Amino acid sequence: MAQRFYLLLLLLIFLVNLICFSSQQDLSFVFNGFNQDQAGDELLLDGFARIQSPERVLQLTDGTTQQKGHAFFNRPFDFGSASSQSLSFFTQFVCALVPKPGFYGGHGIAFVLSSAHNLKKAYASSYLGLFNRSTNGSPSSHVLAVELDTVQSAETDDMDNNHVGIDENRIQSVVSASASYYSDREGKNISLILLSGDPIQVWVDYEDTLLNVTLAPLRNQKPSKPLLSRTINLTAIFPDRKAFVGFSAATGSSISNQYILGWSFSRSRRLLKSLDISELSTVPLFTEQKRKRSPLLIVLLVILTLVVIGGLGGYYLYRRKKYAEVREPWEKEYGPLRYSYESLYKATKGFNKDGRLGKGGFGEVYKGSLPLVGDIAVKRLSHNAEQGMKQFVAEVVTMGSLQHKNLVPLLGYCRRKGELLLVSKYMEGGSVDQYLFNGDKPPLSWSQRLAILRDIASALCYLHTGASQVVLHRDIKASNVMFDDHGANLSATAAVGTIGYMALELISTGTSTKTDVYAFGAFMLEVTCGRRPFDPEMPVEKRHLVKWVCECWRKHSLVDAIDTRLRDKFTLGEVEMVLKLGLLCTSIIPESRPNMEKVMQYINRDQALPDFSPDTPGIGVSTPMVMGIPGLAITSTSVTSSASVPLVSPPSTNNSMFISHTILNGDGR
């Protein structure tokens, strides 16, 4: 009796296992095309996914951006009690990825095993409708996918824009390869374009923990070698031992229609039914949905169009007035040197006050930046008189042709009604007066100071004798001599600076050069003594620098006039020569001043100074009224003018106007 009971119990256990095994074996199906009656009941669709009739295809996405679609078999694939080694499944499907004509589409399609069929929270685009940023890479995602990806994304570490990959719980593939298939006839892999619109066969086989992915064109037999192979523990990804099988597809900014033409699935290789290629539908052509526009919408579009046209017309008139310029036929010959007002307006950010470099008697200077040119300085000058403008522009252009290693040429000009704009290169270094009078700058060595003087003398000599016509500077002072490169390497190289760069003052031609010689002499004393030409804070006897230096010479103590910050680190003979030359250049008798060619010879020690003393007439006189010479002025800016030539010419019709230039390089002496 007991023996019979045990036999019945064993038989019952066998029948239960047989039923379970049979239920697992039953998960086999084939769709040789999709129709609404059969596939509509057996597939779970979401997103855009739909069965398209009468084409009998499963469409996952349409021709719109940021779209996704999912299609899963309505019953999960139940692993049962099978071990990971004995677990297996086999599937074959035919897909087609059809781009919009003339465009490159995306993003791709994936065969999916997922613990849940609801992936509505997943992202489209490069996530292929499988993950979002929070689920991507999470073990709780429980997703295994074989992706056919047609867009290369840096975010997902894609190898190219035409690859196949295996994804485990993340969109970044654990293994991938460029799409191709093995040709048994040729014995090599042949490239396959996924986004061609042509049908492609895909086989995904999982057996003995090995997942193989194989591709081939529609009419080819299954190749003997897979494209991808990967050992995968399926039960580790799906601990509850169940998974839905199906497809996911997505578009991003690039679009395509993505279709499944047929699908076969089985847990057994032997029971897997091959697709009947002859029964599959052809790939539908790419069509965009046509939407009917209501009359109201048409009216609104017309009104909107008129509003836009009116707005654009108003904006055009506003811009035309805002950027209006004055152009005359005679200016055509200067065309290459003329800048548009709009370009200068934008370069200076609307002449923003934050970019203002300085303000002088004739206008303001702004910093700007032009493409292919770099940083510039733009001087805005008021000029209401049209008479003489042609001569003025001609001379400005002539000034732009000056070339000297210590001069930056004028880049160009622009003019509007009542306004003239002059453009020159911008040099970023600080001015000499900042190094002489500000404590936050390192003091200049004597060799640097001498190099500055030699460079400026060279530039002035060129303006007076080397150009096609005599050019006066008439605003030489420490604040107008600037260092390039923020004064970098001052200890190793000569100072680099500018003449009149910050002020961009106007100059004249064809008149006496002695005004520049006087100004240069005052500048020599300023650089050597480290003092301003006129300092009201000093004692009366030291207030005028020219007079005080002459008095030191008279007392045989020129060394007392030298900048104390030099700390005896100078050549006494050089310093005394510079101080005496400065006094000679500042003689209030113009005929007694040397020309700049002579100054160059003196300062370079090519010729000795002429004999003169502190008591020589015109030497060391700080005010012109002592000599009774009317019209001669010596200002606190260390610049003088002769009676026949005013120091700074007012903007009149009889005055030629030029922009000053920039010293580029010292010679390191």
UniProtKB/Swiss-Prot annotation:
<keyword id="KW-1003">Cell membrane</keyword>
<dbReference type="GO" id="GO:0005886">
    <property type="term" value="C:plasma membrane"/>
</dbReference>
<dbReference type="Pfam" id="PF07714">
    <property type="entry name" value="PK_Tyr_Ser-Thr"/>
</dbReference>
<feature type="region of interest" description="Legume-lectin like">
    <location>
        <begin position="26"/>
        <end position="266"/>
    </location>
</feature>
<feature type="binding site">
    <location>
        <position position="379"/>
    </location>
    <ligand>
        <name>ATP</name>
    </ligand>
</feature>
<keyword id="KW-0547">Nucleotide-binding</keyword>
<keyword id="KW-0812">Transmembrane</keyword>
<protein>
    <recommendedName>
        <fullName>Probable L-type lectin-domain containing receptor kinase I.2</fullName>
        <ecNumber>2.7.11.1</ecNumber>
    </recommendedName>
</protein>
<keyword id="KW-0808">Transferase</keyword>
<feature type="glycosylation site" description="N-linked (GlcNAc...) asparagine">
    <location>
        <position position="233"/>
    </location>
</feature>
<dbReference type="Pfam" id="PF00139">
    <property type="entry name" value="Lectin_legB"/>
</dbReference>
<keyword id="KW-0675">Receptor</keyword>
<dbReference type="InterPro" id="IPR008271">
    <property type="entry name" value="Ser/Thr_kinase_AS"/>
</dbReference>
<comment type="similarity">
    <text>In the C-terminal section; belongs to the protein kinase superfamily. Ser/Thr protein kinase family.</text>
</comment>
<feature type="glycosylation site" description="N-linked (GlcNAc...) asparagine">
    <location>
        <position position="189"/>
    </location>
</feature>
<dbReference type="InterPro" id="IPR000719">
    <property type="entry name" value="Prot_kinase_dom"/>
</dbReference>
<dbReference type="InterPro" id="IPR013320">
    <property type="entry name" value="ConA-like_dom_sf"/>
</dbReference>
<dbReference type="InterPro" id="IPR050528">
    <property type="entry name" value="L-type_Lectin-RKs"/>
</dbReference>
<keyword id="KW-0732">Signal</keyword>
<feature type="domain" description="Protein kinase">
    <location>
        <begin position="351"/>
        <end position="609"/>
    </location>
</feature>
<comment type="function">
    <text>Involved in resistance response to the pathogenic fungus Alternaria brassicicola.</text>
</comment>
<feature type="transmembrane region" description="Helical">
    <location>
        <begin position="296"/>
        <end position="316"/>
    </location>
</feature>
<feature type="active site" description="Proton acceptor">
    <location>
        <position position="475"/>
    </location>
</feature>
<feature type="signal peptide">
    <location>
        <begin position="1"/>
        <end position="24"/>
    </location>
</feature>
<feature type="glycosylation site" description="N-linked (GlcNAc...) asparagine">
    <location>
        <position position="132"/>
    </location>
</feature>
<feature type="topological domain" description="Cytoplasmic">
    <location>
        <begin position="317"/>
        <end position="669"/>
    </location>
</feature>
<comment type="similarity">
    <text>In the N-terminal section; belongs to the leguminous lectin family.</text>
</comment>
<dbReference type="GO" id="GO:0005524">
    <property type="term" value="F:ATP binding"/>
</dbReference>
<keyword id="KW-0418">Kinase</keyword>
<dbReference type="InterPro" id="IPR011009">
    <property type="entry name" value="Kinase-like_dom_sf"/>
</dbReference>
<dbReference type="GO" id="GO:0050832">
    <property type="term" value="P:defense response to fungus"/>
</dbReference>
<feature type="topological domain" description="Extracellular">
    <location>
        <begin position="25"/>
        <end position="295"/>
    </location>
</feature>
<keyword id="KW-0611">Plant defense</keyword>
<keyword id="KW-0325">Glycoprotein</keyword>
<dbReference type="GO" id="GO:0106310">
    <property type="term" value="F:protein serine kinase activity"/>
</dbReference>
<dbReference type="InterPro" id="IPR017441">
    <property type="entry name" value="Protein_kinase_ATP_BS"/>
</dbReference>
<keyword id="KW-0067">ATP-binding</keyword>
<keyword id="KW-1133">Transmembrane helix</keyword>
<dbReference type="GO" id="GO:0004674">
    <property type="term" value="F:protein serine/threonine kinase activity"/>
</dbReference>
<keyword id="KW-0723">Serine/threonine-protein kinase</keyword>
<feature type="glycosylation site" description="N-linked (GlcNAc...) asparagine">
    <location>
        <position position="212"/>
    </location>
</feature>
<feature type="binding site">
    <location>
        <begin position="357"/>
        <end position="365"/>
    </location>
    <ligand>
        <name>ATP</name>
    </ligand>
</feature>
